[in-house]
């Protein structure tokens, strides 16, 4: 078995009126990527809080986010997808702009490669158990704290 690398990740729980902001990839099957919250890799030297705000903007196309609080850190082993342990920093974000119930956005990947297309939408917070790859692990902290 290959050695596993550890990667720092930032995940965003954006909640409004009891609804959680999620997305699906338009160019990949549901079976492959499921429903996700905005999340991504923390760049070298980047604060996880800043990474959370950046990922929320990049993946939703929205801009008016603020960090409410850090909810905690959890580790997730994504093997067999690839030999990697993700050290995930979970943040609750507030959104300060109106949105439709559903919209599409694109992440341009810093101009490298084809843009990634997303469909963003809101689901009831209590349906957060459907999130892909353990992304719902700290949803309970939204209520418990």
Indicate where each model-derived feature is located.
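Conserved N-terminal beta-strand and adjoining loop/helix that marks the start
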Residues: 1-21, 40-44
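Short hydrophobic/aromatic beta-strand or adjacent loop that forms the aromatic wall/cage
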Residues: 7-11, 86-90, 117
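Short, solvent-exposed loop/turn segments at secondary-structure junctions
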Residues: 4, 30, 74-78
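Nudix hydrolase/Nudix homology domain
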Residues: 30-35, 100-145
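Conserved Nudix-box catalytic region and its N-terminal flanking loop in Nudix hydrolases
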Residues: 19-58, 62
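Short, well-ordered beta-strand micro-motif
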Residues: 14, 92-94, 121-124
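Hydrophobic pocket-lining residues within nucleotide cofactor-binding pockets
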Residues: 42, 95, 125-128
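Active-site segment of metal-dependent pyrophosphate-handling enzymes
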Residues: 62-100, 105-108
């Amino acid at each position: 078995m290959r050695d596993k690398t550890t990667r720092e990740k930032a995940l965003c729980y954006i909640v409004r009126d009891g609804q959680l902001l999620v997305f699906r990839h338009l160019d990949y099957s549901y079976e492959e990527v499921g429903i996700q919250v905005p999340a991504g890799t923390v760049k070298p030297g980047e604060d996880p809080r800043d990474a959370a705000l950046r990922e929320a903007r990049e993946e939703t196309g929205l801009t008016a986010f603020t960090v409410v609080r850090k909810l905690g850190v959890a580790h997730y082993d994504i093997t067999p997808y690839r030999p990697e342990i993700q050290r995930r920093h979970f943040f609750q974000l507030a959104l300060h702009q109106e949105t439709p119930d559903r919209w599409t956005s694109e992440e341009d990947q810093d101009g490298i490669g084809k843009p990634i297309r997303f469909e963003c939408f809101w689901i009831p917070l209590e349906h957060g158990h459907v999130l892909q790859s353990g992304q719902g692990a700290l949803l309970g902290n939204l209520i418990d704290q």
